[in-house]
Amino acid sequence: MRNPLLQACAMALIGLTLAGCASTPAPSTIADTTARTPQLSTLNRLIVEAGLGDTLRSQGPFTVFAPSDDAFKAVPAKTLAELGSNKELLKSVLTFHVVPGKTMAADVKNGNAKTVNGANLALGKAGTMVTVEEAVVVQADVAASNGVVHVIDRVLLPPKQ
């Protein structure tokens, strides 16, 4: 290139392209998203206790129906104590909230979805309202690099086995 103006424009374009790439943060994983969301602090603590952090940082994709802190406050103290003392039960309950694949709220259909723990979750949709078992999605489509998180208003308990 002999034209100095053309050279300057090309260099500016390259610089802007590189600057744009550098300023775009990598999306957070589901585990990182729950960890930095204040209303999911109880869920995050339980994910750590159950040893599921690495799973929720893996490639996925996953759809997580994440009970809010208020949802955990509604769980009887006896049930919470049992979850705290039984790691396998805790894992079973938490993985009952996780469905393989990435399902955005707009894509939810009435029917069942198989969870990571092997049980089925009943999903429902009426207009824009999405339900999961008896829970209502109160915040939908929280994007993560390995899936999506939907905040729900209840803790889901898997069927007795």
Please annotate each region the language model reported:
Residues 2-161:
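Mature, structured domains of secreted/extracytosolic soluble proteins
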